[in-house]
Amino acid sequence: MLGVRCLLRSVRFCSSAPFPKHKPSAKLSVRDALGAQNASGERIKIQGWIRSVRSQKEVLFLHVNDGSSLESLQVVADSGLDSRELNFGSSVEVQGQLIKSPSKRQNVELKAEKIKVIGNCDAKDFPIKYKERHPLEYLRQYPHFRCRTNVLGSILRIRSEATAAIHSFFKDSGFVHIHTPIITSNDSEGAGELFQLEPSGKLKVPEENFFNVPAFLTVSGQLHLEVMSGAFTQVFTFGPTFRAENSQSRRHLAEFYMIEAEISFVDSLQDLMQVIEELFKATTMMVLSKCPEDVELCHKFIAPGQKDRLEHMLKNNFLIISYTEAVEILKQASQNFTFTPEWGADLRTEHEKYLVKHCGNIPVFVINYPLTLKPFYMRDNEDGPQHTVAAVDLLVPGVGELFGGGLREERYHFLEERLARSGLTEVYQWYLDLRRFGSVPHGGFGMGFERYLQCILGVDNIKDVIPFPRFPHSCLL
């Protein structure tokens, strides 16, 4: 009997009987409200932050934004409404009817029936001021508030769309996404610019390592991707990387995001360069199609003329020159460089930017670098006295180096000799073992995500394209 009563009770709760006739307002994002095809008085609810307040004799106008779009939704309310807390920056919930707007400035507007202030904002003390276009340098002081400005909001939406576009490109191309570790015992760059990890508090034990070996924040996921490329022919990762570089330049951060890929069974740089160019162009085209208003805002207020420069990059095939040719171009330049170009020396930022300009402001691949300039895993070209490796960098306008990559040394004895000369054989024995068991020709590349955003948007300082920039002597929040 008890079972029957429980069954009847459950049937009652699962009944298809209608709810009370009161129809709640449909919650919409500002973007969806602005894009509504039928603005015939549907009752809706939006939540967001006030971007502007304008009071007239009989009508009160608000513009409310929730971050879903650059454009705000105009809210029209009776002027008799208590507006004391309806300040710039206050968070609100608005219910009302979505109607066609009589103004040519917007297609729809929300006729408010109820406005609820969720959180008041004292506009006098708020560091972001109404109708004031703050310099990006000023906004860096307020990482907890700068996302509320139009420019940073646009950059962060573009960042989100670019992330999705990159994942989409790799998925459509048959790549497997690998989560490479943040904590590692390897230094894939060989530069020694590492953040070492130590436990704090009671776990801190002198003369011992938590992992029994020194551990660091990763500088690259490449070596772990190479492990995976022995089982999957195409792999990629997208995540944070860390460099303990004491640099305050406009291109460097201590924490940034990297897109890295490894491809098995490739034996030419041309194969890698084709994927790199396709990735850059496909991602950029997707960003331009998904958030044109945000890109337009950045180009208008941050980098006038960037739209034309970007279109120039997209419509032209990327160029290819060798490192040796690059050095000759620099030597013949009329420009005086701070660092004298010479064969065997690394290309500096001033050199990279000159080479791009020399090539008509089209992205240019520089290939076949001196062996001494690149890490131990780059494939030896066996090309005589100059001794180069099959490495490639992509240089782009305004930024310089954007991609770096190359063919990996898959031949056991070549790699063994390189490691022995560097005294790294014991540390990288596992890496050597990959060449003993089913090794294949393979190669890969990495792209700095923040530099990519700088490139397409024309943002001069890398600190302005990441939500919370980390750099020497600064770790706000």
Curated annotation (Swiss-Prot):
Task: Spell out the InterPro entries in the cross-references.
Answer: Aa-tRNA-synt_II, aa-tRNA-synth_II, aa-tRNA-synth_II/BPL/LPL, Asn-tRNA-ligase, Asp/Asn-tRNA-synth_IIb, NA-bd_OB-fold, NA-bd_OB_tRNA
Superkingdom is: Eukaryota
Transit peptide per record? 1-14
Annotated keywords: Acetylation, Aminoacyl-tRNA synthetase, ATP-binding, Deafness, Disease variant, Leigh syndrome, Ligase, Mitochondrion, Non-syndromic deafness, Nucleotide-binding, Primary mitochondrial disease, Protein biosynthesis, Transit peptide
This enzyme's EC code(s): 6.1.1.22
Q: Which GO terms describe its biological process?
A: asparaginyl-tRNA aminoacylation
Cite the Pfam families for this sequence: tRNA-synt_2 (PF00152), tRNA_anti-codon (PF01336)
Q: Which residues carry this modification: N6-acetyllysine?
A: 353
PANTHER family referenced in this protein's UniProt entry, alphabetically: ASPARAGINE--TRNA LIGASE, MITOCHONDRIAL-RELATED, ASPARTYL/LYSYL-TRNA SYNTHETASE
Main function? Mitochondrial aminoacyl-tRNA synthetase that catalyzes the specific attachment of the asparagine amino acid (aa) to the homologous transfer RNA (tRNA), further participating in protein synthesis. The reaction occurs in a two steps: asparagine is first activated by ATP to form Asn-AMP and then transferred to the acceptor end of tRNA(Asn).
Assembly with partners or alone? Homodimer.
Clinical note on disease: Combined oxidative phosphorylation deficiency 24: An autosomal recessive mitochondrial disorder with wide phenotypic variability. Some patients have a milder form affecting only skeletal muscle, whereas others may have a more severe disorder, reminiscent of Alpers syndrome. Alpers syndrome is a progressive neurodegenerative disorder that presents in infancy or early childhood and is characterized by diffuse degeneration of cerebral gray matter. Deafness, autosomal recessive, 94: A form of non-syndromic, sensorineural deafness characterized by prelingual, profound, bilateral hearing impairment. Sensorineural deafness results from damage to the neural receptors of the inner ear, the nerve pathways to the brain, or the area of the brain that receives sound information.
Q: Which family does it belong to?
A: Belongs to the class-II aminoacyl-tRNA synthetase family.
> What is the name of the protein in this document?
Asparaginyl-tRNA synthetase
| Species the sequence originates in | Homo sapiens (Human)
Read off the lineage from the record: Eukaryota, Metazoa, Chordata, Craniata, Vertebrata
